[in-house]
Design a protein with these regions (language model features):
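N-terminal leader/signal peptides at the extreme start of proteins
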Residues: 1-16
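N-terminal single-pass transmembrane signal-anchor helix
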Residues: 13-39
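Surface-exposed intrinsically disordered loops and tails
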Residues: 80-126, 154
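Short, surface-exposed interaction loops/tails
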Residues: 123-164
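Amphipathic alpha-helical segments that mediate coupling or scaffolding at interfaces
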Residues: 7, 21, 42-45
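Aliphatic-rich helix starts adjacent to a transmembrane/signal segment
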Residues: 38-59
Length: 164
């Protein structure tokens, strides 16, 4: 009897069987799926928060640029940030806004293009969208927002920053 048990122990295979490995891999795949479904929404919320901070920075720089110009500026609605250089409508030919554009360019580190700002927007709602602004001369209020959410006005934008 002792010889029989000794022979069984000698012939005993070491390691895991293929079935055991497949079961472990299936369990791991299920766990990864559960974790990913819980983490992905938080990642997009983080990107949205970062986009909001980028727009807030643009709004702050625009408010500073308007204040530095010291000019009475006309109202603007739905102007792309890249129009601050005065080359495109609705700001074309308006030297007061061109001064603001030069100030904004200095404050923004030279990035005056909407494309340059879009590279900083990382959420799915912000990527590839134009960065627009409105200016109300009566109140001095500036709204900076992202297009592409049904229409190109501030009220329909998912991302909007209003100067106080």
């Amino acid at each position: 009897m002792k010889n029989y048990v000794a022979k069984l122990r000698e012939n005993e295979e070491k390691g895991f069987s293929l079935v055991e490995l497949i079961i472990v891999m299936a369990i791991m795949a299920i766990l990864v799926g559960i974790v990913a479904s819980q983490v992905l929404p938080y990642m997009d919320k983080s990107r949205q928060s970062k986009d909001q901070q980028q727009l807030s920075s643009v709004c702050t720089n625009l408010v500073s640029a308007v204040a530095q110009s010291g000019k009475d500026l006309p109202d603007v609605s739905g102007a792309d940030v890249k129009t601050l250089d005065g080359s495109q409508t609705p700001l074309a030919g308006n030297t007061d806004w061109t001064t603001v554009g030069a100030n904004f360019k200095d404050l923004n580190g030279g990035a005056i293009t909407s494309d340059g700002l879009n590279g900083k927007l990382g959420s799915k709602n912000g990527k590839g969208q134009a960065v627009l602004f409105d200016y109300d001369s009566a109140t001095g209020e500036i709204k900076v927002y992202v297009t592409g959410h049904g229409s190109d006005d501030a009220d329909s934008s998912k991302y909007i920053v209003v100067s106080k």
